[in-house]
Amino acid sequence: METVNRAFFDNYLDAWNAHDSAAVARHMADDAIYEDVALGRVLHGPSEMASFVEEATRSSSDFRFEEVSLFTAGTDYANEWVMVGTNDREVRGVPPTGRSFRVRGASIGKLDASGRIAENRDYYNLSELLMQLGISPPAPSS
């Protein structure tokens, strides 16, 4: 069984920071499950992951992750990061706010036997992100 290694995560974050959706997708197992808990989205496999990366980086030319720490135990990992960028591009007809964001978060996951991401859950404060962008968070549901 493969264990988590530093180079794998350096390459993974480099791919995100280069907005290289295909390279990010290559880090995912064919049957990977990637969950963005804040958005309530669950992605399946490399193809959906590539589309997600394109969507996530579309509104920010300088979107990137800054790693804070990486903890590993066998094939399990916890990666603390800061998501940084500027909302400087129009998306789906919505004009950019021009505001920057800096939001702390973490990824918790597991690699498969081939050393690719089998499971990943991202946690961050969506309300904090929306407030920094000058966008009101959605009203609580009843």
Segment roles from a protein language model:
Residues 1-142:
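C-terminal and inter-domain tail/linker signature
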